[in-house]
Amino acid sequence: MTERFDCHHCNESLFGKKYILREESPYCVVCFETLFANTCEECGKPIGCDCKDLSYKDRHWHEACFHCSQCRNSLVDKPFAAKEDQLLCTDCYSNEYSSKCQECKKTIMPGTRKMEYKGSSWHETCFICHRCQQPIGTKSFIPKDNQNFCVPCYEKQHAMQCVQCKKPITTGGVTYREQPWHKECFVCTACRKQLSGQRFTARDDFAYCLNCFCDLYAKKCAGCTNPISGLGGTKYISFEERQWHNDCFNCKKCSLSLVGRGFLTERDDILCPDCGKDI
């Protein structure tokens, strides 16, 4: 007796008929398509065994149904893009959704490298320095007056030049007497200490820190011989081309402060009236 060879689902004999094996079990074509065939996204019909099943992200189409949602041209073996569950050819997608290059005004095609800045887009080859016309790419750039500059060109064309070293000032500049300086170039003429953020003074157009200015130019106190800066509200006494700090203007003998008092002189000494009576 001949062994039976039936459809695993409907039990109809498969002798002399077309069948499909699934997990080693045979099915007639009707049962296989009913049970296992994918449904076409476009027409809603099963994709039969005799049809090519085209799939994209767990969705399936008949070959004849796999076309652009707008122009209806076939997408078989062609690049395409998906937008909100719709498949579009590259031309339709670009016309509808792709951004336009800020420079050449042409569409930036899907898959093309582009540069974006403040809501605008450029082809990579169109995003160039306004001065040297070279592509900026991923390098640093500086925008000015709706134009983009690579850093070297910006420094040459727009950055202020330090009055000391004559090089561009890109960050952290100092203005003194309406002239720009690098912070590291604006230093004391004597000790070369940076003056940015420090108190300083000038003589003959040269800047000095307070210590150097006092050492070089300040008058010396006749009492302690230290400089009298005259800066910051420092008070001092001047008499016959000699100067004293207020705290140093005292009687030579009794050390009484003579500020605001009468006094006498004995050679280079100053004396209070009481000590001067014995002269």
Swiss-Prot record:
Covalent link (Glycyl lysine isopeptide (Lys-Gly) (interchain with G-Cter in SUMO2)) residue numbers? K78, K167, K220
UniProt domain LIM zinc-binding: residue ranges: 40-92, 101-153, 162-212, 221-275
Pfam families named in the record: LIM, LIM_FHL2-3_N
Positions of C4-type zinc fingers: 7-31
* UniProt keywords, alphabetically: Cytoplasm, Isopeptide bond, LIM domain, Metal-binding, Nucleus, Phosphoprotein, Repeat, Transcription, Transcription regulation, Ubl conjugation, Zinc, Zinc-finger
Localization (cell): Cytoplasm; Nucleus; Cytoplasm, Myofibril, Sarcomere, Z line
- Positions carrying Phosphoserine: S238
Tissue/organ expression: Expressed in skeletal muscle and heart.
Main localization of the protein? cytoplasm
Q: Please verify whether the record's keywords include Heme.
A: no
GO CC terms: focal adhesion; nucleoplasm; nucleus; Z disc
Gene Ontology biological process terms, A to Z: atrial cardiac muscle cell development; heart trabecula formation; negative regulation of apoptotic process; negative regulation of calcineurin-NFAT signaling cascade; negative regulation of transcription by RNA polymerase II; osteoblast differentiation; response to hormone; ventricular cardiac muscle cell development
| Record's keyword annotation contains Repeat | yes
MF terms per GO, please?
bHLH transcription factor binding; identical protein binding; transcription corepressor activity; transcription factor binding; zinc ion binding
Q: What is known of its domains?
A: The third LIM zinc-binding mediates interaction with E4F1.
Subunit comment for this entry? Interacts with ZNF638 and TTN/titin. Interacts with E4F1. Interacts with GRB7. Interacts with SIRT1 and FOXO1. Interacts with CEFIP. Interacts with calcineurin. Interacts with FOXK1.
Q: What does this protein do?
A: May function as a molecular transmitter linking various signaling pathways to transcriptional regulation. Negatively regulates the transcriptional repressor E4F1 and may function in cell growth. Inhibits the transcriptional activity of FOXO1 and its apoptotic function by enhancing the interaction of FOXO1 with SIRT1 and FOXO1 deacetylation. Negatively regulates the calcineurin/NFAT signaling pathway in cardiomyocytes.
Protein name stated in the entry: Four and a half LIM domains protein 2
Natural source organism? Homo sapiens
Question: Gene of origin?
Answer: FHL2
